[in-house]
Amino acid sequence: MSTSSCSFKDRRVSILCCKFCKQVLSSRGMKAVLLADTEIDLFSTDIPPTNAVDFIGRCYFTEICKCKLKDIACLKCGNIVGYHVIVPCCSCLLSCNNGHFWMFHSQAVYGINRLDSTGVNFLLWGNLPEVEENTDEDMLDISAEECIR
């Protein structure tokens, strides 16, 4: 991944939830834009969501680039919430990107900004460990108080 010339460490970390059923899909979300069309907002994550989504349908390619994609659906309600980049194309790999291969449509998910350990400041991607001690499974039982924040 070509991330050396661009930095994502100051981006906020979000909890990603399904808009249709409120299911937590990931605790490591980042607001992003589509590489092939920067007018399209989305969310992404670097770690495969655990017990929250599954593949649906067949692999496909877009007209804009040659990435091989497969849709993902929420396990709770069955709605398509995004896609996984199965095989990224050279053009996207060479672009300024965050290295994430799990993408979520902004029409299908919403993000809740996470707070750091002080509980006062937003958690930034640069302060997030590569592999967190808390897994996404732990985040599935998110409290109502956390969702309200």
Curated annotation (Swiss-Prot):
A Pfam family annotated for this UniProt entry: YPEH2ZP
GO CC terms in record: cytosol; mitochondrion
InterPro entries xrefs: YPEH2ZP (IPR026768)
Keywords attached to this entry: Cytoplasm, Mitochondrion
Tissue distribution: Expressed at high levels in stomach and also in kidney and, at low levels, in heart (at protein level). In the stomach, highly expressed in foveolar cells, parietal cells and chief cells (at protein level). In kidney, expressed in endothelial cells, mesangial and epithelial cells (parietal and visceral epithelium) around glomerulus (at protein level).
Subcellular location per the Swiss-Prot or TrEMBL entry: Cytoplasm; Mitochondrion
Major location (coarse): cytoplasm
PANTHER family per UniProt: PROTEIN FAM72A-RELATED
Subunit structure: Interacts with UNG.
Function in brief: May play a role in the regulation of cellular reactive oxygen species metabolism. May participate in cell growth regulation.
Protein family (similarity comment): Belongs to the FAM72 family.
Name this polypeptide is given: Protein FAM72A
Organism in which the protein naturally occurs: Bos taurus
